[in-house]
């Protein structure tokens, strides 16, 4: 007669609720290499939904900027049609006339020519400011900078003649992007600068 076994019977298997899936899913992240091959990842890549939401927000901001420009030009046309006072201007006519006379071929200038130039220059400055401000808002800044004007010029085909006058500082843009990635404040990236006088620096001529 054989002796009875004293080992308890194995417990029943747990109920199967679904297909077993490892967590995190296999292949979701590339396998780490180097001395920290067995360390868990600290940051997961952003989900595709976040990237799609960011792209949608960018497209919405661009559409809003385009709508603002359309409203701006419609308002300018209304102002021109209802203008009756041609004596008061935001830009000095004497300065404009002096610039016009810088051309040696110009001998005489009619009285209404500087008036038209003053209005055209004012509209040019306003449109360029609108486009630069749209770029500043895209970067979540409330201060219009030279880089915003340069970006507006680069984006607008009719402003191509200004590319050499206001070149875009690619090195500064790369420096700002690297600073943001490292979490370091940088004025060009819309973060508060460590130096409060950063915006008041004037490059020597």
From Swiss-Prot:
This is Nuclear transcription factor Y subunit C-6. Residues 1-24 are annotated as: Disordered. GO terms for molecular function: DNA binding; DNA-binding transcription factor activity, RNA polymerase II-specific; protein heterodimerization activity. One of its GO terms (biological process) is regulation of transcription by RNA polymerase II. Its main location: nucleus. One of its GO terms (cellular component) is cytoplasm. Pfam families: Histone. Belongs to the NFYC/HAP5 subunit family. It is found in: Nucleus; Cytoplasm. Component of the NF-Y/HAP transcription factor complex. Gene3D superfamilies: Histone, subunit A. Keywords: Cytoplasm, DNA-binding, Nucleus, Transcription, Transcription regulation. It comes from the Eukaryota. Heterotrimeric transcription factor composed of three components, NF-YA, NF-YB and NF-YC. NF-YB and NF-YC must interact and dimerize for NF-YA association and DNA binding. Interacts with NFYB2. Interacts with NFYB8, NFYB10 and HD5/NFYB11. The keyword Transferase does not apply. The gene is NFYC6. The keyword Nucleus applies. Signal peptide: none annotated.
């Amino acid at each position: 007669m054989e002796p009875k076994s004293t080992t308890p019977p194995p417990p029943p298997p747990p109920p199967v609720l679904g297909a077993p899936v490892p967590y995190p899913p296999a292949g979701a992240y590339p396998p780490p290499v180097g001395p920290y091959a067995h360390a868990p990842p600290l940051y997961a890549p952003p989900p595709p939904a976040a990237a799609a939401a960011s792209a949608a927000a960018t497209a919405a901001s661009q559409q809003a900027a385009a709508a603002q420009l359309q409203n701006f030009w419609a308002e300018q046309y209304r102002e021109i049609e209802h203008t009756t006072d041609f004596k008061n201007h935001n830009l000095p006519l004497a300065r404009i006339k002096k610039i016009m006379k810088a051309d040696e071929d110009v001998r005489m200038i009619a009285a209404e020519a500087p008036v038209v130039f003053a209005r055209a220059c004012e509209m040019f400055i306003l449109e360029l400011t609108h486009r630069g401000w749209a770029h500043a808002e895209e970067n979540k800044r409330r201060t219009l900078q030279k880089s915003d004007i340069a970006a507006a010029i680069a984006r607008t085909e009719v402003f191509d003649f200004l590319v050499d006058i206001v070149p875009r500082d690619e090195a500064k843009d790369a420096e700002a992007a690297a600073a943001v990635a490292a979490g370091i404040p940088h004025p060009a990236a819309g973060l508060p600068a460590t130096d409060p006088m950063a915006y008041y620096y004037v490059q020597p001529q």
